[in-house]
Design a protein with these regions (language model features):
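A conserved beta-strand element that flanks and buttresses the S-adenosyl-L-methionine
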Residues: 9
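Short glycine-dipeptide loop
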Residues: 33-39
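A short, conserved alpha-helix within the catalytic core of class I
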Residues: 16-29
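Class I (Rossmann-like) S-adenosyl-L-methionine-dependent methyltransferase catalytic domain
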Residues: 1, 39-120
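Active-site micro-motifs of SAM-dependent methyltransferase domains
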Residues: 15-16, 45
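Alpha-helix termination/capping residues and helix-transition junctions
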Residues: 2, 31-32
Length: 120
């Protein structure tokens, strides 16, 4: 029997993944290994991608040269909503509330929870 964990947490790594297919595989693994909630923190917001790069280029005019080949993956919330629907999970999104963290306006957190089993 494979051990299950109370929950799973990912903090600040999803934007380093090569594509959404890989992210999907990771979430499937997180779901398989848990019996409780899943939290994915520091997800780069696709609706703020242009703002993110404009801000970075303002801080570092040579940003594109300095970070060439170090791509970031930005996610639409619908990606996580589809995953939740497929697996009967509830999903919620929260802005990152971390005073002084320059990246906070460009990211959000995702929380999946399993539906409570009904006891009649």
């Amino acid at each position: 029997r494979e051990e299950k964990y109370d929950g799973a947490l990912s903090d600040g790594v999803f934007h380093y993944f090569p594509n959404e297919a890989y992210a999907q595989e990771v979430m499937e693994g997180m779901l398989e290994k848990t019996r409780g909630n899943i939290a994915i923190l520091d997800v780069h917001d696709a609706t703020k991608e242009e703002e993110f790069f404009a801000f970075r280029r303002q801080l570092d005019p040579d940003y594109d040269e300095h970070y060439r080949g170090l791509n970031k993956l930005f996610y639409d919330r619908s990606f996580f909503e589809k995953f939740a629907k497929k697996h009967g999970l509830t999903v919620s999104f929260n802005p990152l509330a971390l005073d002084g963290y320059w990246n906070a306006p460009f990211v959000y957190s995702v929380f999946f929870s399993r539906e409570a089993e009904r006891k009649d």
